[in-house]
UniProtKB/Swiss-Prot annotation:
GO molecular function, one term: NADH dehydrogenase (ubiquinone) activity
Membrane-spanning parts: 76-93, 98-120, 190-212, 222-244, 279-301, 316-338, 358-380, 390-412, 419-441, 483-505, 510-532, 536-558, 565-587, 621-640, 683-705, 718-740, 745-767, 797-819, 868-890, 905-927, 966-988, 1008-1030, 1073-1095, 1105-1127, 1172-1194, 1219-1241, 1248-1270, 1296-1318, 1330-1352, 1357-1379, 1418-1440, 1444-1466, 1478-1500, 1504-1526, 1533-1555, 1559-1581, 1602-1624, 1639-1661, 1719-1741, 1773-1795, 1802-1824
Organism of origin: Nyctotherus ovalis
EC number: 7.1.1.2
Cellular component, GO annotation: hydrogenosomal membrane
Protein name, UniProt field: NADH-ubiquinone oxidoreductase chain 5
UniProt topology in membrane: Multi-pass membrane protein
Amino acid sequence: MTKIVMLDYIPMLNNGGHRHPADIKPSMINSLLDSMSIILTSLCTFCEQLSLNEAIIVNLGINTLDQLLMSQAGRYLLLYYCIYALELYTVCYSTLSLILLYLIQLNYILLTNIVGYLQYSCSEIANLVYTYILLEGLLDVSELDALVVETLLDYLWVPCDLIIRYYRAYWYFEGVYFNLNIPYVQRSAYWLCVVIWNNIGWWTYQLMIIGWYSLSCLCIRLVPTILAIINLILTYIDLIIYLYDIYSNYSNMTWLGILYSTINSIIRYDISRIHAYQHLLTVIIPNYCLAIYNSGLILSSLLLDIYHYQIGLTILALQYLVAPLYISCSLLIYILCYIMTELLYSRSFYIDLLLRLLEIIYLDILVNSLISIIILILSVDVAYLIQLQVIILSQYINIISGYVAMPTTILITWYLYNIAVYIYYLVDYIATISTLIIWLLERILWVYGICANNIEPVVIDLPQLTLTSLDALLNQLLSEWCLLDAIMNVVTSVILLITVSCLGVLRIILFIAVYPVYCIGVLLLNTLLQVVVGLISYIIGTFMNAIILICDIYVYSIHRPFLPLIMYVYFVAAIILEPIIDIIHTIILAEHALFNTYCYIIFDILQPLHLQAFEFYRDLIWLIADLILAYIDLIRSTLVEGIISFIKWRLEQDFQLVYDICEFYLDEVKPRIIRYWNIYSRWVRFLIYCAGNNINLLVLLYVQFKGYTLPMIILFDLTRIQLYATIPVIISSYIYQGILQTMLIISYYNTLLVATLEFIQIWLTILSVSPEMLYTSTLGILLRSYYLLYEILLLEPTWVLFECLSTCVGLVELYLVTVETTVSNILIIDLILMEVLLEDIRQVATILTCILDWYILETCLDMQYADILLLMSSGLQSTVLNTIFDLLSLLGLLDETSIRFILELTVQVCTIPAALYSTIIYPYIVLVTRCLLYLPDVVQLYLTIGEYLLRETLYQLLIDWASCKLYSYNLYLLELYNIYYFWLSLLEKYWTFTYHIYNYTTLVELSPDLLISLISYIIDICILSLELLLEDIRWGSTIFVNLLDWYLLDTQLNIQYIDILLITSYSVQNTLLTVVFYILNLCGILNEISIQILFEITVQICTILATIYCTVVLPYILIILEILSYLPEIVQLYLDIGEHLLLEILWQLLIDLLYYRAYDYILIAQLLCKVTYLLYIVLEQLLLVIIDLYIYIIGDLLIIGSCHVGNHIIDILCSAENVYFLYFMIFIGYLLCGIFAFFYHGYLGTRGIFYLSEMIIMGILIFSIVTLYYNLKYHLALDIILGELALSNEVIFTNIITFDILSILGVLLVATLTAIILTFGVEYMLREAFAYNVLATLVLFSASIICFIVSYSFGLMIIFWEISGTLSLFLIDMYYARIRTTQAVTRTFALNRFGDLWMFTASIEIYSLCHNDALPTLFALLPYAQFNLSILGNLIFDFTIPTVIVFSIFSAAACKCAQFLLFVWLPDAMEAPTPASALIHSSTLVVMGIFMILRFAPILHLSVYTLYIMSILGSLTVAYGAILATQTSDLKKAVAYSTISQIGYLFTGCAFLAFRATLIYLILHAICKALLFVLVGYIVHMFGGTTSLRRMGGIYYIVPDIAIYMFILCMVLAGAPYTVGFFAKELIVTTLTNTSSPVATFIICCWIISFACTPFYLYRICVLPLFGRPRCSRRVFRNIVSPQSTYNFIDSDSSLNSLLHKFTNLITRWSVQGRFTNLLHLLLLLIVLFCGEFLVFLVTGLFGTSTTLFSDTAIDDSVYQLTDYYLLSYYRVRNIQLLIIVLFALVTLYITAINNQLTFNIIYLSVVLPILAIIFICLGHYFLVDFTVYIYNISNSLIFELLCDLAIC
């Protein structure tokens, strides 16, 4: 009955696959349950019958396993039970599969019953399978019939039949399946392994599907149902784990175990039965070993399949969230990988284990007969596994080799070179000192010998040499020698006396101690060098010999898959040699001068590579090869029976010699290799550690080495690549010699191995003929010798190889993870981009189709739209297709899916130009869709489409040309060129495409005939295109002739038509010739037909051109010549007619026509030269035409040559690059001017310094504006690298300057302020004695600031930082005679040095991190440098390197900008002259300090603590500066404290990263503060030098213009409503109010304090001196200013001033009465109190009264928009603001018009207002604000109209 059930359900599974749960009915489940009960009953019956049969077997007398195996009945009985068990297993499996598929539709009761059945049945089935495995392992089925085995295998048929069929096909292919000599035990066990594993995989898959659907469908059911399903899942997981344990137990019985059990069963018999096993040894055992080998191969492939299958299974398990199953699969993968690793790495262990087992048996005969075969089988098996692994590792082997060796090679070489250099200098220094001491001693001895009246020097006691003896020596010399000798000896004695008295006994002791040490050191150095050289020579020789042995054994063995692995081993050996050779080369370079004699010893290091060891092994190999070849020849030439005794005698002698040599190698050489290899392995591990820690700084470098491309990853700076590039050149000669010797040895080994194999084959033949040869001792010696050879040549290289692989495994894992992640991300992104691109192209195609429909319906062809469509189609076609092909070629995605995808894209792209000629859209799409699967058809399709498009395009071109569309012809012809280029490039890309397809798959192949037909087809298309072009040009010639006839009939000389003809003719001939030559060069079809066509085309083109030239251009040129011949008359005519006609006639004639045609003539001449060179042999008529044309062209060029050159020079000078170059040269000139004026100011004088500086500053301003225009228009930022200075390996000083928007704005600001202050300084200090000194210092000071601004390296910034700081000290110390000045300079110096200390701290950190000071390098590396600097064990702070650098820069800027607690020096700076104070306050503080923070803006966010400190410090400075300004009564110090307070705003803005707002307020504050200082200087000067506010007043009555200027400046600085200061400061306040940090409250409190104090000190600064009553004496007030004074700004004698004088007298009367003064003071106090910051806070909504003025959600960081709900409307705010500016300008113009002394007004009008306008316009352009809109709105405003009416009245 079970048989019937099986036949019912098995076909349903095999044929139908998995049934849908809805197809299964409850009746089928009931029958399945009945079948389950029958199965369980049969199972019990089987167990009972098994027990009965065991009893029957015992009764038959079969007590042992051997008896059961030897019994035929027992074998058939066991086979019957196995078949029955498998039948039950198959039925149970089918039943369980159906039950699992029906689980989703079951209810709770049925589900619980099924769970119980499944638990019982699964355990029973597992027991059955395990029983079968045990029984099958005991069977010997080799003698059974093959049909019985086939029946047994048929019962193992499972739902995974596809895998079984695959393996059957594989066995059939290998010729093993029908070999009856193969033991079926192994095959049956193998099939059972496959069946069990496939069942596990299928069950797992079903389990995941069922679990997923069960959880999703039953999640809304009752909890017991879900628990039952979970119980079912856990039960099946237990079943899988149980079956895996069974599989593991079975897999432990490896083929070695089976062989070992077989040998054990054989050797249990007596030795007397050995003869009975001769047949077994000669026939069965070799076949058995062959079966073991084949089974091992299949098992290896099975393990790999299991490995890959489990990877997919693991991913699927993760997707279905089955955690226990995932753990089981992961464990299984780990165990399988471990098994493969053991098989890969434990070959020597298996061999040793087998040898030990065989040594226990004491059967020499069996050992001598089987050992070589077993070793061969094991090596082949493991070799196959290694081959599988090498396929994976071969792609990364070369990278790993460079990865390991190269980084530390360079590092060690560099350090050794430095050490050698230092030793050289040390030795040189010691030698110099020793030489000096020796010379002194010799001199002493010589003098003392003369003193003793001895000619030869005598040995004396050195301590006896005293001053007394020297005096005696001097006296004796004077008495005995002549005067000259006496004088020389006196000089010598004096030198000796000075030397002895200064150095004394120490130098003598030094000489006595150093000289012997020096001699001993040189001796030791020579000895040590010789020892090291000998040791290195021995190590290299030994190791290279070992590597060569590895190459010999593996490269030319029968296992060729080892070749990539052996090349890797050889490259490792070459890399090992490189460090040693680098060390030698470095020593040679460093010590060449002192140790030249040692070079020969060093070069002898590589001698063992080709002299000693090679000769020894070569002789040894030739000896063995000669012996074996002699034996082979002897065996081949004589009879086997007659030479057996001779062979025995020779073998005993010769192989004993080989055996002794091998034993000597094992005893002597092998320990040395092991010791040297241990040293090398430690070295390699260190290299891996170094490379692993620096993985982020690796650079990929390709080095071509002897035909092999070796990618090596090196670890060193890019600047050292040039140093290392010489290393391969040095070592190439030595490596090449090693390669030659290695190839020679490999050839020797090849001969040896071939002879050995032939010898073994013949020897096996001998053994099969004469089995008694097994018992001789000669064969035992032979086999032991081979065993030793295998141990030497096979095992040791394997050990070395796996040591290398084990050391590189860490790098392989790291590299694979990185590459895998990167490639996967790139593939995902590119696929998404391609999908988006396809959708985009579809939309564009739809849009263009609509446009074309509209275009076709139009009655008149509008050329503009046609050009647009052509350009769009051409651009899309070329760009999109090239991008797609490049992406697919790079990523290797050229499979079936990508072919379909790219064809779809091509259809979409090519539909656009095809729609222009609406006849081929439908055929094209049909053809494309027809050829989606075959590549040759696709290529043919594109060629067909190309021809069709070409014909249609040319036809359309002829129609358009016939319509006289001359301009469009050029575009159409370029479109033709693009189409040609597109199809040719497309064909080239398809060649590449075909190559990739041919490499990766074998589905598509291009036959040679097809390729030839494709090429011929291309040539036909090109010839056809040339014919069409010729026809096209003939049409064009006719049209041109008609046009020229029409032109000649015209009476007027129309320049426009001439331009049309010239441009068209040039475009036609240039484009056509380019297309023709390009096509001919690409296709190579310069045959007779193409030359004829080309000639006709050229004749037509040149005829057109010559006709146009002769009929149009030549008369035009003759007219020009005639005009030029009457040049004097023309000049007189120009004087009469005027400048307008001059520009309209002569300039337009020469420049607009001839200049633009000259370059065209040159190109025409070049093209015609090419044509002439090709055709001058055949065609003489064309030569005449070309010669005539040349005559006209040369005449034309002679006329316009000078004009062309001049305009070309102007264009060169006006280009952007030259603007930047001239800009840089002006900077250098200004710096040199400052240096010259500072050191040689006496040659120039005050006026010379002033005029020279002002001229250069004007140039700087002009070029700054031009450069700013280029930067804003083209978004440029030019960086100029002036060179590098390597102070050491770790410190590289880089000279970089930059011209970006920030630096140019800074230069504009500083230059403007310098010009203002220099003009003011000349007038202010005209009567000072040291005025030139002040001006020279100011010029150099501003030059250093400008250089600081444009510097883009930290080293340059430090240099100019120090220069400017030093010059500021010079400026402060001008009145050095004053005590207060000296004290001020001291305090300023101390605080500046404190800031410089922080700058040097930042430089140390930057050089230690980046090794150079370039700011781009710092900005790139600093975000990734998170190295902690712990202070007090992290109890206080935990700083990082970016925090230290940012804090140091902030601290330096805080010192320079006089922040809180660091502002003491700023009031002291008021001791300087007023011009110096103005420049210091406006430039040094504002520009340098804040500019440095803005320059380092990209890294400020890396230190949050620094930003908090900066915001707190800036807020304290704001409040404290304002408080101090209210308390001081000194005018200059009040302005200084106001500067401190205002800079606090800038610091706070930088702390909140509002850099754009900070930059705007920086420029505004600098200009206003500089002008304020100028006005304060005038006021102080007018009051006789007093600065006390208590002694000032009434300035408005005397000089009202100064009062107006100062009042406006104070309002701007205070932030009066609708002024620039109001909006600039509001940007910073808005940033603060939008911040929710805990520091914001404290900052707001500080700012409120400042806002409260600001009106008071501005009131005191502005109102008291200007509008207050005069507080000085009448004499002083009377003598302040006279109308004729230099500093009077109003001329009282002017008639225009009467109204102003009346108004002044009125004010004076009111002032005397006191009414107007009080009212004016009250009004100004109210304005100052309620202006500025309070109104800003009010508008921004901080006090809850209104909304913010600017939008919080702006489009950009720098673009603020106004909305409708604000307090004031947008245009009203802007109009009122600009109205104030216009009123201010009108007042200035009025004052200028009525003033005689225009000094200050000229400054303001010529410098300040233009610069302010330019800066605001540039900033508006930068912030996307259009000021023309505001001007337009002002012109339309009612207030402006009213003002104009008043002005007219």
